[in-house]
A protein has these predicted regions:
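Phosphopantetheine-dependent thiolation modules in NRPS/PKS and related acyl-activating systems
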Residues: 1-76
Length: 76
């Protein structure tokens, strides 16, 4: 499931294990360097390129997962 993959990436990059689907990336301490690492992980681990503007527009696991699903992306 895409949201599981997204959550795994966020937990690793934000160094937290308690991220829920509606937690806001920025409220969790996210910033541009971490966002760039997450963007790379999406490509490498989920096989989908997510533009930076979409990452800003979809700052929760649930919303970015829905965006990725709307692309028809499949996890590897």
């Amino acid at each position: 499931m895409i949201s599981d993959g997204v959550r795994t990436i966020w937990c690793r990059e934000l160094k937290r294990d308690d991220i829920s689907g509606d937690d806001d990336f920025f409220a969790l301490g996210g910033q541009s360097v971490i966002m760039a690492r997450i963007q790379g992980a999406y490509i490498e681990e989920l096989g989908v390129e997510v533009p930076m503007d979409q990452m800003y527009l979809n700052p929760t696991v649930a919303s970015i997962s829905a965006y990725i699903a709307s692309l028809g992306a499949a996890t590897r």
